[in-house]
């Protein structure tokens, strides 16, 4: 099994991970927001409530044991550049995805706003895994397994969390 090197960093309590794609920004946006696209690498989603600010979605994480369904609130959506989401439930968290295009390359910046830096040890490897699934989906490559990311990347993120 090949171990994936961690790429994320911490900026205060924000976990930041980037990926680059040789594709137009609109194409990458579609991979992130179209239910048929997300169903192939992250999981399907559907609108629950589109009545105004804080529109709600339900999503299924197909890579997680038991394929759990959860809900989240869309806090901001500036197509095709920025998406901010807050998950619902007792373990709620917020994250943002920003896309920037330069020439024929689109850079995705993922930011998870952590309540506590120490949580990076658990969240970092998971987001590395999911963002690599997106890369592999877009490039037609076989998906990797979560155990290639966790626990091998956990110490990297714990070390980052220990640096103030």
Where are these regions (language model features)?
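A short beta-loop-alpha structural element at the N-terminal edge
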Residues: 19-25
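A detector for short, charged/polar N-terminal pre-domain segments
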Residues: 2-8
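Short beta-edge strand/loop motif at the mouth of beta-sheet-based domains
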Residues: 9-10, 14-17, 35-76, 80-82, ...
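Short, highly charged C-terminal tails/helix-capping segments
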Residues: 136-164
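Beta-strand/loop substructures that line and gate deep hydrophobic ligand-binding cavities in soluble
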Residues: 84-138
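A generic beta-sheet turn/junction motif
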Residues: 21, 63-65, 78, 89-90, ...
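Short, surface-exposed charged micro-motifs
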Residues: 7, 73, 94-98
């Amino acid at each position: 099994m090949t171990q994936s090197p961690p790429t994320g960093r911490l900026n205060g309590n924000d976990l930041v991970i980037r990926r680059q794609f040789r594709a137009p920004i609109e194409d990458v946006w579609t991979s992130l927001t179209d239910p048929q696209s997300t169903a192939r690498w992250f999981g399907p989603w559907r609108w629950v409530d589109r009545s105004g600010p804080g529109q709600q979605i339900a999503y299924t994480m197909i890579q997680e044991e038991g394929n759990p369904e959860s809900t989240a609130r869309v806090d901001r959506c500036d197509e095709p550049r920025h998406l901010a989401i807050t998950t619902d439930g007792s373990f709620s968290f917020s994250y943002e995805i920003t896309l920037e295009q330069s020439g024929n390359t689109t850079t995705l910046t993922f930011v998870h706003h952590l309540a506590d830096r120490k949580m990076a040890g658990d969240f970092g490897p998971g987001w590395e895994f999911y963002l690599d699934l997106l890369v592999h989906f877009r490039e037609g490559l076989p998906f990797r397994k979560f155990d290639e990311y966790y626990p091998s990347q956990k110490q990297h993120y714990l070390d980052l969390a220990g640096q103030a």
